[in-house]
Amino acid sequence: MAAAEPAWEAVIGLETHVQLGTDSKIFTAASTAFGDDPNTHIDPVVCGLPGTLPVLNQKVLEYAVKAAMALNLNIAEHSKFDRKQYFYPDLPKNYQISQYDEPIAEEGWIEVEVAEKGKDTYLKKIGIERLHMEEDAGKLVHAGSDRLAGSTHSLVDYNRAGVALAEIVSKPDLRTGREAAEYASEIRRIMRYLGVSDGNMQEGSLRCDVNISVRRGPDAPFGTKVEIKNMNSFSAIQKACEYEIKRQIKAYETGEPIVQETRLWDEGKQLTKSMRSKEGASDYRYFPDPDLGPIEVSVDQREAWRSELPELPAVKRHRYADDLGLSQYDARVLTDERPMADYFEAVVAAGADAKLSANWITGDIAAHVNSNRLSYAELPFRPEQLAEMVQLIDGGKISGKIAKEILPELLEKGGSPKAIVDERGLGMISDPAALQAIVDELLAAHPDEVKAFRGGKNKLQGFFVGQLMKKTGGKADPKLANQILSKKLKG
């Protein structure tokens, strides 16, 4: 009996283009502002006019090196720029200044948490082949079609041309669409933590191209690689990979050839479609750019930049779980954006319990910030004020119900939770004698329910707890109230 063939396996790598958040472009002082009128941020260097010379923006080099360090890449002591030759309307010089065989950084990795549907969350280490600097191209707007073919005419906006990019090339270590999406998400998270890019996919600040093939099991040679473009969300990356995996497997099983090509993800139709044949490196005729000198980063400069790196999200996640006792879920949510993590840490530093603080921040406070499109810096309810509220709850001074009642006002105006509680008499009733008197009144008012409870209907204790909370406006100490009720009901 013939052995069963190994299961199909996808092999996926990502090329992630990160727009570096410098005020001026990579080789000129022209502005990088987004959303302005077309062709208002151009100059002779951007347009490649005769006699112009590019000069490397040193902030671009700093951001690229810091990004590379955060991705555990080895920084090259010497690297250079190359000209990548191709002809397209959005490329004014008819070549792109990039880095080919001597990039600024090589051989790194990041660790990602992957939550596949129906499976336990797992950690995966993804290799990174290189990071190199290059200039962005302009943008084409096609009339009558979403692509050049089929359009009646095209307009070119060169505002984006010359904006600095860091291209991050992963190794082919990804195996599912979910892994690809999580990897891209972690790259964006790291870049935002560093402050080198806003990572806004809708504005094109972060763009991902997927290279994908399938093969029969992990020991089989790689299949024919297909590149996918036009994915503007992490969800689109996952869905495009999943569709393409199925398409390629079906093609192999039906004898249809897979060609090396570039395909576009069609979000509306939820499929990939052929765009053009894929070029190889030789098609671009790379050669060193004669107008730009070699790039040298000294050991002292590297170490100075390394000392400025913040604590990165993966390190924070581990610390929150291991040192603060948070769940993996809470640690992940809190570290997704650096401002939220900074807010949380300020609350804990002010003396609040970490788990209670995490619950309030990831719940009501995050909902308020998101629905009102606020930054944490703009939030009137400052970390030390939230810490005060958490301490009131933790110390039994107020109930969670009371905290929820005063929270909307605090979120809108800020202020001292303790002052509000004292001024309005909202403190928790924790005096046993006072609670006993209230319980006696309550039992006297409900003799039938007391008789039913003593006859075996123990669930009625919940009724009495509810009535007690109603009578006290939610201010009764729940633990003490239950103890007194239990004792009184049993007679």
Swiss-Prot record:
Its EC number is 6.3.5.-. The keyword Membrane does not apply. Keywords: ATP-binding, Ligase, Nucleotide-binding, Protein biosynthesis. It catalyses: L-glutamyl-tRNA(Gln) + L-glutamine + ATP + H2O = L-glutaminyl-tRNA(Gln) + L-glutamate + ADP + phosphate + H(+); L-aspartyl-tRNA(Asn) + L-glutamine + ATP + H2O = L-asparaginyl-tRNA(Asn) + L-glutamate + ADP + phosphate + 2 H(+). It comes from the Bacteria. GO terms for molecular function: asparaginyl-tRNA synthase (glutamine-hydrolyzing) activity; ATP binding; glutaminyl-tRNA synthase (glutamine-hydrolyzing) activity. Pfam families: GatB_N, GatB_Yqey. Belongs to the GatB/GatE family. GatB subfamily. Heterotrimer of A, B and C subunits. This is Aspartyl/glutamyl-tRNA(Asn/Gln) amidotransferase subunit B. It comes from Parasynechococcus marenigrum (strain WH8102).
